[in-house]
């Protein structure tokens, strides 16, 4: 997909990266996929994402990878914040994320999320990690 996701013809990028981790095969089953290029290898399959905190500041991102059964049974450590949000399920948009109130809530969430990051996060150059990421394969 590249380094920037384009939102439409003639529109700017939305300053995020899209990583394909699984796809549906011809039988309708989800099949893990991974990037294998040098220095950019990824862990295939569905994942969970959490953030841990120390003294009310984010100190680590936790990415958990495993089978559907392993992920369903996984219990994060106390105090970890679940970072995954279900915007769409079975082709249906979650109404909590539509309309004016959703935009106000997103604005407030962003402000809170920035306040939880270490102060140095606001002075980083593009590409520098804000906090470490730990990957756990179950």
Segments and roles (model prediction):
Residues 2-138:
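Gly/Ser/Thr/Ala-enriched C-terminal appendages of enzymes
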């Amino acid at each position: 997909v590249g380094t920037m996701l384009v939102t439409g013809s003639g529109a700017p990028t939305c300053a995020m990266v899209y990583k394909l981790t699984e796809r549906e095969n011809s039988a309708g089953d989800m099949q893990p996929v991974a990037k294998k290029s040098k220095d950019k290898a990824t862990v295939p399959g569905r994942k969970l994402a959490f953030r841990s905190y120390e003294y009310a500041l984010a100190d680590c991102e936790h990415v958990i990878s495993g089978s559907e059964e392993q992920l369903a049974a996984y219990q994060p450590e106390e105090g970890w914040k679940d970072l995954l949000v279900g915007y769409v399920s079975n082709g249906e948009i979650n109404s909590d994320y539509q309309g004016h109130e959703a935009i106000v809530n997103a604005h407030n969430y962003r402000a809170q999320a920035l306040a939880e990051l270490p102060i140095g996060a606001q002075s980083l150059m593009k590409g520098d990690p804000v906090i470490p990421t730990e990957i756990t394969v179950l």
